[in-house]
Amino acid sequence: MDFQQGLISTVHDYSLGNHNAIAFNQELGQRPTTLLIPCLMEEFSRPALTLIRDTLAPLTGLSSLVIALAAENAEDVAAAEAFFAGMPFPVHVHWTNGPAVRELLESVGNLDLDVTGPPGKGWAVWQGLGVACQDAE
């Protein structure tokens, strides 16, 4: 089943507007928080991802960032890592369709579980959550 959001997505109100940036950053430091961003490689050439990166850069209280990336090759993964280099928190670029991940997911087929796709942002989020949970408390 395919789901289309349309032109305007719902952004839930988490009362972030009630916080100033300093208080929000301090609160992040008190509660371990990992942010997960599913990405396609072509999004790195668009202004939105640069804005997201630049907005996250001052958040020293963020525990980590997981980028669930669909990329064609290892050079693209390295470019994504370079794009997020210098952040004040650990950044893990997870190559969702890389050879090691494909091999692992295909091996689960022996258990009669099909977890190989279909590829897309939902599939990337599913994988990224697994990566983010590795360091969860």
How should these model regions be labeled?
Residues 1-61:
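N-proximal low-complexity "stem/linker" segments adjacent to membrane-targeting elements
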Residues 11-19, 74-136:
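Active-site-proximal specificity loops/subdomain of glycosyltransferases
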Residues 34-36, 64-66, 92:
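A structural signal for isolated positions on well-ordered beta-strands in alpha/beta enzyme cores
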Residues 40, 65, 130-131:
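Broad hydrophobic/π-residue packing in well-ordered secondary structure
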Residues 61-63, 136-137:
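Short, surface-exposed connector motifs at secondary-structure boundaries
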Residues 69-72:
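Acidic ATP/Mg2+-coordinating residue in the GHKL
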